[in-house]
């Protein structure tokens, strides 16, 4: 979640969905939410989808005569057959080399392109949004504020009882006072920070989120405890710590380009981006590259925030942020595509395609843009043997497209079919999923 510093709080009345009240949304300002990471639960657990949304489930599915964009390299493999068996990619080879299993369900791939499913690397997940992610080809998400309902959804998705993208989640956010969001892990001293990290790791969180109001000594205690427990920490640049110190700390990812506003423009938020000093960009890029951190810019949602400024200022702010993202790419900093969806400023699912367009408009090459939503997230999460590419042995999370996204990225938003964990959505099943998503 972005620190909007008063710029869009007046918009927050739009967050009226019932789920927000019972499943931890991130619009409501609640105080005193420190303590246990277990939030109030919804009255009912996540439920499987109704029968009409069921995808085709088969032990064998064969995509025949399809062109493959594997995404672990910048090539297009033509006239391939891709066989999926038991939810894994079993075969990727020339059609002429492959004998089809007799019981395989065949999908004619002639004139179509198969690529990995997409990853949204910054979401705030609600069960009601699961169909939207799938309908837009998003088969993996990184949830950026953990709570019990997310853990429940993850377990149901992984055992096939609930349809949705695979979830990788951070812990609830660790922050200093005042607590801003539900289940904030409020820490006010190094000792509290050390104990909180130990408790969160004991609860099973494998990635920690830091937030914006940690004091420098408390942030350092979180860093040391995370290292001691061998868990990565990600999130915001705390205001009193600053960009340089966060990069030196080993924070694995930085969200929203936070901290760069101050480093480049001398002020937080839109004011910093409005007065960005381009002469400071090379140093900030070098710091970032040397740190090994990944950056998740969330350009599209920040455009919504900047829209509260004048049209001229909003254009400058968006342009400066795109300029900096291009500089990060040119400086070999790995980028992640993320949206901040789930807070009602951008729509789940469709906003990822807006973010991809922002990357392209920033001047990033199409392959780099696509990689930031496929193979790069897999590398960041250490899951290259699970997802992010069309390769034998990986999870069968796939998009079937009517064209080549390397030449026309818009084809991503209207897939011919979607496979998530081996379940195939096309035709009526895809149409039903699309209707349920609420974004069509």
Where are these regions (language model features)?
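Divalent-metal coordination cores built from histidine and acidic residues
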Residues: 109-114, 129-238, 251-260, 265-308
């Amino acid at each position: 979640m972005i620190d909007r510093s008063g710029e869009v709080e007046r918009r927050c009345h739009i967050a009226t969905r019932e789920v927000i009240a019972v499943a931890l949304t991130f619009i409501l300002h609640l105080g005193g939410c420190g303590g246990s990471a277990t939030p109030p639960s919804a009255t009912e657990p996540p439920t499987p989808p109704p029968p009409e949304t069921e995808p085709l489930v088969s032990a064998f599915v064969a995509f025949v005569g399809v062109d493959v964009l594997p995404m672990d390299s910048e090539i297009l493999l033509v006239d391939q057959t891709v066989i999926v068996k038991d939810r894994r990619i079993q075969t990727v080879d020339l059609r002429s080399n492959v004998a089809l299993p007799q019981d395989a369900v065949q999908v004619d791939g002639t004139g179509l392109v198969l690529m990995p499913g997409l990853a949204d690397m910054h979401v705030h997940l609600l069960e009601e949004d699961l169909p939207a992610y799938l309908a837009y080809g998003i088969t993996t998400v990184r949830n950026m504020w953990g709570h019990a309902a997310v853990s429940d959804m993850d377990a149901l998705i992984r055992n096939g009882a609930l349809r949705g993208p695979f979830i990788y989640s951070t812990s609830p956010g660790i922050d200093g006072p005042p607590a801003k969001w539900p289940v904030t892990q409020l820490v006010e001293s190094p000792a509290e920070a050390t104990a909180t990290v130990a408790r969160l790791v004991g609860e099973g969180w494998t990635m920690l989120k830091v937030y914006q109001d940690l004091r420098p000594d408390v942030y350092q205690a979180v860093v040391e405890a995370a290292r001691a427990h061998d868990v990565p920490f990600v999130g915001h640049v705390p205001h009193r710590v600053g960009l340089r110190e966060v990069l030196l700390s080993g924070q694995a990812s930085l969200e929203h380009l936070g901290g760069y506003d101050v480093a480049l423009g001398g002020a937080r938020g839109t004011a910093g981006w409005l007065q960005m000093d381009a002469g400071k960009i090379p140093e900030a890029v070098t710091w970032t590259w040397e740190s090994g951190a990944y950056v998740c810019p969330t350009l599209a949602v920040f455009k919504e925030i900047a829209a509260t400024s004048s049209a001229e200022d909003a254009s400058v702010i968006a342009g400066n942020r795109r300029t900096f993202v291009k500089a990060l790419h040119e400086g070999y900093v790995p980028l992640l595509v993320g949206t901040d969806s789930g807070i009602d400023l951008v729509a789940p699912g469709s906003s990822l395609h807006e973010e991809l367009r922002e990357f392209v408009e920033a001047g990033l090459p199409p392959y780099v843009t696509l990689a930031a939503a496929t193979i790069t997230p897999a590398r960041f999460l250490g899951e290259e043997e699970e997802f992010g590419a069309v390769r034998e042995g990986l999870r069968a999370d796939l998009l079937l497209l009517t064209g080549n996204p390397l030449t026309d990225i818009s084809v991503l938003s209207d897939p011919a079919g979607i496979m998530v964990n081996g379940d195939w959505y096309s035709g009526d099943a895809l149409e039903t999923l699309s209707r349920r998503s609420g974004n069509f």
